[in-house]
Amino acid sequence: MDVPEPQPDPDGGDGPGHEPGGSPQDELDFSILFDYDYLNPIEEEPIAHKAISSPSGLAYPDDVLDYGLKPCNPLASLSGEPPGRFGEPDSIGFQNFLSPVKPAGASGPSPRIEITPSHELMQAGGALRGRDAGLSPEQPALALAGVAASPRFTLPVPGYEGYREPLCLSPASSGSSASFISDTFSPYTSPCVSPNNAGPDDLCPQFQNIPAHYSPRTSPIMSPRTSLAEDSCLGRHSPVPRPASRSSSPGAKRRHSCAEALVAPLPAASPQRSRSPSPQPSPHVALQDDSIPAGYPPTAGSAVLMDALNTLATDSPCGIPSKIWKTSPDPTPVSTAPSKAGLARHIYPTVEFLGPCEQEERRNSAPESILLVPPTWPKQLVPAIPICSIPVTASLPPLEWPLSNQSGSYELRIEVQPKPHHRAHYETEGSRGAVKAPTGGHPVVQLHGYMENKPLGLQIFIGTADERILKPHAFYQVHRITGKTVTTTSYEKIVGNTKVLEIPLEPKNNMRATIDCAGILKLRNADIELRKGETDIGRKNTRVRLVFRVHVPEPSGRIVSLQAASNPIECSQRSAHELPMVERQDMDSCLVYGGQQMILTGQNFTAESKVVFMEKTTDGQQIWEMEATVDKDKSQPNMLFVEIPEYRNKHIRVPVKVNFYVINGKRKRSQPQHFTYHPVPAIKTEPSDEYEPSLICSPAHGGLGSQPYYPQHPMLAESPSCLVATMAPCQQFRSGLSSPDARYQQQSPAAALYQRSKSLSPGLLGYQQPSLLAAPLGLADAHRSVLVHAGSQGQGQGSTLPHTSSASQQASPVIHYSPTNQQLRGGGHQEFQHIMYCENFGPSSARPGPPPINQGQRLSPGAYPTVIQQQTAPSQRAAKNGPSDQKEALPTGVTVKQEQNLDQTYLDDVNEIIRKEFSGPPSRNQT
């Protein structure tokens, strides 16, 4: 058999396996022609028109001849680097790259070339051993690493976990780690194929000065190749190459371990290997511009390379979505010492690689610079939809954390709410469509206040709708809807065992998105109820909310997280016409006495609908239940008129929160609604519809006692009486005593506004101190009784208060005060003697004789220092005569008058009031 003459090396070198006396098999090794001869220096320029033969002896297609081989000059300056640096493999050999030499011709498919090693090189004990046998003693490890790894300057690319989820097809539907850039299996246009309107020469003009190793290498089907394998990047492997295993990909490509030829202890191991970006930005690879690892020499060649790659990654003319990448705050330099972990130095630990806007960072990963590759998108994206790019160095709040929908100028708002009922579908049945809006469309969400031109990602998940803090629902998850009518791009992902749907928010749409791709999936109750720590019951927890969350990056590096939740959605499989539903209530609180009317608006109300109030403890035990009275005459199918029941405890000191629900039958009840009972304030008020708002006293802010004073609450009165006949404001003065026998002096003249009370005492009387007095009052005589009344201007000798209304005189109570009355001076409240005056009191009421009395005040002689006496006139109460009479009933001015000579008759009147109070039954109009 004639042995052909060995062809000379295209670069003028003999190759590592060419030694004198070498076997013919070594000379016939064609791998030296294909980028695997890197132990000899560059001697001459390659011949562009030289034919290249395949290992089988058949010529490659003609388009291979369109490209010549040129030496790699940009990285030639790396030759001075010591072993173990990134440039060291390039310094010991030459590199080839492809350059277009064919003149521009007819437009057609661009050539795709894969220079692969020979078949013999892949077999253990083949030509590789023969070549290694001829190496010098100081170069065996270097040649071993170089032959199998084809050293080149590359970017680190993670393991296969970053490209696909378990049990899911890769973006290219292939088990091969390199097939994701194949146009045959990838959902995207292959980065290796140039645009149709470009000539063959314009495949990659930016790469004309870059070695061929930086271009994507897509091997033809059934062609052996060396590439990163997705299943063996992190394990310890033998330095001896082993026979390659068959791949499960459709193309039946060979795959070889990236670590089987890269030995960790070898100081000359190849640096990180990666496919570099293609002329079109790849959907899986992005380049970061500031993450050159420490230890890489800042040479001119590296600058040219990085600039070219950055241009490709940033200036993208196509519509493939942009990627995110993570910048480590302190990238770890590549160590030159041998690795102790047994791993190749260029392999990073396994980390999770996140999709667009996904911020779930691996907490335990070491600081590093890595590429973030998004997971597969189930459907092909429409052109020109870039997805947001957010650094993931900062941890984001988990889904269980409650977030506000507004922060600063940003606000996430649900413009169109979903329908209150949506039939969720089970895992074993078909989809029931996306959640719809009451108007017939779909919910709409918009982010307000965002002024940047970068898109963001809107996350959607299903949350709870009960009285507890909003969190992901245990029995329902979001479901991605696809179809011809779906216009919103979306994809699913898992965040903390919760399925999340992510859609883009784009500035061109004013950061507004229509949610037409989100359905609701019902999980099996048994699967969730048997989960450890789960206490909810699936059949009783059928109400959900659509929760929307967005993360807004700020120029300062801070990330603002906003969250908005929709109205409750009933997902029960029962008919929506069976269960009553409360959509609105006109009031959510009242006093413990109840009695007020509440209007409920909703759906599916019937004539038999009942409203039940109940209270539960923190541990879920029911301690109170009361059925409210429903006005069946006024009630409608969508409206109920309910009288609020009285709370079980009328002496509460703090507000109590209870729930109520509408029930149509045994199991047809609405979701619980919230209601609050407030304690009785220090001063109660008349119903607000009987008086003008201008006549209602303002809420008091303090009191002499320890009981709190709550704001004015409208309530139904048991009787129409009031302390003051026309609900005119009453004021109170506080005076203090220095000693029991000292003269009374006005210490702090202040007025107190109070409204209505069944009993007045210093411990219960709330008051405030408005500036009502023109001058302080002085009480000089301790034995002087004071008559305080309202009359015409200039009648009194005290200070005059501001005018209030017209001067019609009506009956009004008279307040007597005498410090000499021993019955009133006794008790522990002697220091707080109160002088009260009332409006709407005529001068004719000041008379020497005892008046006719029809009502009095409950007073304890030893504890209460004030006495209130009311007189009546033939005229009716001003409050009963309408607004016009009410305005006329008020006096023009209020005067505090000090009478100089009062006889004992007034003291007798005081004693008579007390005797009648305690001897006879209380009158109907008593306050």
Swiss-Prot record:
Residues bearing the modification Phosphoserine: 23, 53-54, 56, 99, 107, 110, 136, 150, 170, 173-174, 176-177, 179, 182, 215, 219, 223, 238, 245, 257, 270, 276, 278, 282, 328, 365, 757, 759, 761, 860
Task: Give GO BP annotations, semicolon-separated.
Answer: B cell receptor signaling pathway; calcineurin-NFAT signaling cascade; cartilage development; cell migration; cellular response to calcium ion; DNA damage response; gene expression; lncRNA transcription
> What InterPro entries would the database entry show?
Ig-like_fold, Ig_E-set, IPT_dom, NFAT, p53-like_TF_DNA-bd_sf, RHD_dimer, RHD_DNA_bind_dom, RHD_DNA_bind_dom_sf
Tell me where on the tree of life, at the top rank, the source sits.
Eukaryota
Name the residue ranges with Polar residues bias.
216-226, 798-812
Keywords for this entry? Activator, Cytoplasm, DNA-binding, Nucleus, Phosphoprotein, Repeat, Transcription, Transcription regulation, Ubl conjugation
- Which segments carry the region annotation Transactivation domain A (TAD-A)? 119-201
Ranges for the region named Required for cytoplasmic retention of the phosphorylated form are 163-177
Q: What is the effect of changing residue 425 to A?
A: No change in binding to DNA
The entry's note on the tissues where this protein occurs is: Expressed in spleen, heart, testis, brain, placenta, muscle and pancreas. Expressed in the thymus. Expressed in the lung. Expressed in cartilage.
Q: Where in the cell is it found?
A: Cytoplasm; Nucleus
* Listed Low complexity bias regions: 267-277
Q: Where are the sequence repeats?
A: 186-202, 215-231, 274-290
Q: Which residues bind DNA?
A: 423-430
Region (3 X approximate SP repeats), start-end ranges: 186-292
Q: Motif Nuclear localization signal: which residue numbers?
A: 253-255
The RHD domain, residue ranges: 394-576
Notes on the domains = Rel Similarity Domain (RSD) allows DNA-binding and cooperative interactions with AP1 factors.
- Quaternary form? Member of the multicomponent NFATC transcription complex that consists of at least two components, a pre-existing cytoplasmic component NFATC2 and an inducible nuclear component NFATC1. Other members such as NFATC4, NFATC3 or members of the activating protein-1 family, MAF, GATA4 and Cbp/p300 can also bind the complex. The phosphorylated form specifically interacts with XPO1; which mediates nuclear export. NFATC proteins bind to DNA as monomers. Interacts with NFATC2IP. Interacts with FOXP3. Interacts with TBX21 ('Thr-302' phosphorylated form). Interacts with KAT2A.
Its biological purpose is as follows: Plays a role in the inducible expression of cytokine genes in T cells, especially in the induction of the IL-2, IL-3, IL-4, TNF-alpha or GM-CSF. Promotes invasive migration through the activation of GPC6 expression and WNT5A signaling pathway. Is involved in the negative regulation of chondrogenesis. Recruited by AKAP5 to ORAI1 pore-forming subunit of CRAC channels in Ca(2+) signaling microdomains where store-operated Ca(2+) influx is coupled to calmodulin and calcineurin signaling and activation of NFAT-dependent transcriptional responses.
Q: What is this protein called?
A: Nuclear factor of activated T-cells, cytoplasmic 2
Q: What is the species of this protein?
A: Mus musculus (Mouse)
Give the classification, highest ranks: Eukaryota, Metazoa, Chordata, Craniata, Vertebrata
